């Protein structure tokens, strides 16, 4: 989908410097990933080691004309009365013909724009979180669903405060299913990701010790991850995991709980047996009362667990 720069200015509540007409198809936070400069909107993000504002002159020289910046970085004269030399080189602060969108926080503006974009779609969206296995579950699900549906998914492991909005922006008019990862490292981070992804189906993978130093307990981390699914219609999880099962009970979640288990025959998917031969695993399962088998091209425990998570959602 394409947005005019005027509409984006309104959606993110920006103050616009410059009046060049433009259409935006691509969002950029890393100058090394530039592909289509004419239709790119660059968000100048700060990190502990870097400042995206420093790359604006270079991107201008490479053809980018639309930028989201922190307030106070540019003046009207930077995008209007500049010499021909400055305009052509992008040096000396000259950004002739550019659109500068000033906001308090470029990161929050990026997230808000992705959230507004997500609002345009009424299709099944699968949100995947957990300490381990998010990317593998997403990719297995993609392999299972893509022969039958047009699927939009997170690139690579794009599951951060920056990666999630960039992923959700990829939703297009042809999308029939979305698969998005969400990763957190400390309490309070999931709220923004939930607002962007707005999953209708949730998948909680295994929990581990990653980022545990930022949480008081494993239960606190589990509850933070489960908050992604506050409004989801269905949540799939491993009921054999005591922490996950306890958190699901405490979460107050009122949608459908789609559990899988190797121990509980009452689970939505009960794994009767797993056979491993050469490089293939065969799952013998009962799913909502119906028996079936599933063949998977891997035999290690972590891959098999991800396979089960993907299968319970795909079925």
What does each of the following model-derived ranges do?
Residues 16, 81, 100-102, 125, ...:
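Conserved beta-strand scaffold positions in the cores of enzyme catalytic domains, especially
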Residues 68-75, 239-243, 262-263:
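Short, polar loop motifs at secondary-structure junctions
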Residues 218-219, 256-315:
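Adenine nucleotide phosphate-binding catalytic loops in nucleotide-utilizing enzymes
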Residues 51, 224, 239, 302-309:
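A generic structural signal for residues located within well-ordered alpha-helices
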Residues 107-254, 315:
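Phosphate-binding loop of NTP-binding sites
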């Amino acid at each position: 989908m394409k947005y005019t720069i005027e509409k984006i200015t309104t959606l993110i509540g920006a103050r616009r410097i410059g009046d060049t007409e433009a259409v935006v198809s691509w969002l950029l936070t890393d100058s090394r990933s530039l592909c289509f400069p004419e239709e790119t909107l660059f968000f100048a993000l700060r990190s502990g080691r870097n400042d995206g504002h420093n790359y604006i002159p270079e991107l201008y020289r490479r053809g980018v004309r639309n930028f989201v910046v922190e307030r106070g970085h540019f003046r009207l004269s930077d995008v209007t009365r500049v010499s021909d030399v400055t305009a052509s080189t992008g040096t000396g602060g000259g950004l002739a013909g550019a659109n500068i969108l000033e906001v308090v926080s470029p990161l929050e503006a990026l997230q808000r724009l992705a959230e507004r974009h997500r609002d345009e779609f009424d299709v099944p969206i699968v949100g995947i979180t957990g300490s381990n296995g998010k990317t593998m579950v997403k990719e297995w699900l993609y392999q299972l669903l893509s022969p039958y549906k047009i699927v939009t998914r997170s690139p690579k492991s794009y599951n951060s405060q920056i990666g999630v909005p960039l992923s959700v922006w990829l939703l297009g008019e042809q999308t029939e299913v979305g698969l998005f990862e969400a990763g957190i490292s400390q309490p309070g981070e999931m709220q923004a990701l939930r607002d962007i992804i707005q999953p209708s189906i949730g998948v909680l993978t295994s929990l581990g010790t990653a980022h545990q130093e930022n949480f008081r307990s494993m239960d606190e981390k589990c509850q933070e991850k489960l908050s992604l699914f506050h409004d989801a219609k269905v949540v799939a999880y491993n009921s054999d995991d005591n922490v996950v099962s306890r958190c699901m009970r405490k979460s107050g979640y009122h949608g459908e709980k789609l559990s899988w288990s190797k121990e509980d025959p009452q689970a939505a998917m009960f794994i009767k047996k797993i056979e491993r031969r050469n490089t293939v695993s065969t799952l013998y399962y009962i799913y909502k009362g119906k028996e079936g088998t599933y063949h998977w091209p891997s035999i290690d425990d972590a891959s098999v667990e991800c396979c089960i998570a993907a299968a319970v959602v795909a079925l």
